[in-house]
Swiss-Prot record:
One of its GO terms (biological process) is lysine biosynthetic process via diaminopimelate. Pathway: Amino-acid biosynthesis; L-lysine biosynthesis via DAP pathway; (S)-tetrahydrodipicolinate from L-aspartate: step 3/4. Its EC number is 4.3.3.7. It catalyses: L-aspartate 4-semialdehyde + pyruvate = (2S,4S)-4-hydroxy-2,3,4,5-tetrahydrodipicolinate + H2O + H(+). It comes from Methanosphaera stadtmanae (strain ATCC 43021 / DSM 3091 / JCM 11832 / MCB-3). Belongs to the DapA family. Homotetramer; dimer of dimers. This is 4-hydroxy-tetrahydrodipicolinate synthase.
Length: 297
């Protein structure tokens, strides 16, 4: 399937009582689509999936699919450190009408490489749905090896990887292997780090699952589209202009800075689920300055 372009790892708006704010979520989805993004992700890390109940997890997927209404690619966060739970979430995502599922590598229990492969192999065999594998060793404690990524690329339903390991040398090995084994046409590599999207596209990535696009969907999409079309001078300019914003969104635990930025912009997306706290006053001053530099407040 075509996964080129800019996909947004969406925040989840909450009411004052910390329940999901469906009205704001639908408004936010429209804001992103009108901003020119190619896809949206519900119940990812930025969407606070770790602190959503199963019912809430399913609800945000349902809202996303309904509100998008075929206008963009819908990606359902469906990962778990229990393979059986991931299987249930992928199957739910398919039944809900999502286009593709995003499945993080199992976290905390730190399976060996064979365990990681078997996790995705079971999902491949038992779920009739395209799956994006998500590799983010800084959060999970495990890193898909080059060999494992290549093996996953050979599975029919594992159609892409969101690669958030910042090691560009490793990525070069991945692309060399994908090319030599004629897998590039059927397997997509997406950036999982906004600041590395441009260099990753230059190596062969087809886009990004982005956090900064929550704030500036149009500019992020324009940067990615220029890079994909080979207009690297323009893409580089836009990437450099976006860098301080990309960086400040991780000045504290994500998605705290992103949600604070959106609230400062008047988007009224609510607070955070514990144990994530609001950002400190000192960092809010820094965040405000960068938002002002980008004419966002």
């Amino acid at each position: 399937m075509n996964l080129e372009g800019t996909h947004v790892a969406m925040i989840t708006p909450f009411n004052n009582d910390n329940t999901i704010n469906e009205e704001k979520y639908r408004e936010f989805i429209d804001f992103l689509i009108e901003g020119g993004v190619d896809g949206i992700l519900a119940a990812g890390t930025t969407g606070e999936s770790a602190t959503l109940t199963l019912e809430e997890h399913q609800k945000v997927i349902d809202i996303m699919v309904d509100q998008a209404n075929g206008r963009v690619t819908t990606i359902a966060g469906a990962g778990s450190n229990a393979t059986s739970e991931a299987l249930d979430l992928v199957n739910y995502s398919k039944d809900a009408g999502a286009d593709v599922a995003l499945v993080i590598t199992p976290y905390y229990n730190k399976p060996q490489q064979s365990g990681l492969y078997n996790h995705f192999k079971l999902l491949n065999d038992q779920c009739d749905m395209p799956i994006i594998a998500y590799n983010v060793p800084s959060r999970t404690g495990v890193d898909l090896s080059v060999d494992n990524i290549i093996n996953l690329a050979k599975l029919d339903n594992i159609v892409a990887i969101k690669e958030a390991n910042p090691d560009l040398n490793k990525l070069a090995h991945v692309f060399s292997r994908l090319n030599s084994e004629n897998l590039l046409d059927d397997f997509t590599v997406l950036s999982g780090n906004d600041s590395l999207t441009l260099p990753m596209i230059s190596q062969g990535s087809k886009g990004v699952i982005s956090v900064v696009a929550n704030i500036m969907p149009n500019k992020t999409s324009t940067m990615v589209n220029n890079a994909l079309n080979g207009n690297y001078d323009e893409a580089r300019t836009l990437s450099n202009e976006l860098f301080n914003l990309m960086d400040v969104l991780f000045i504290e635990a994500s998605p705290a800075p992103t949600k604070r930025a959106l609230n400062l912009m008047g988007m009224d997306v609510g607070g955070l689920r514990m144990p994530i706290n609001e950002i400190c006053d000192e960092n809010e001053v820094i965040l405000k300055e960068i938002l002002k530099e980008n004419n966002l407040i």
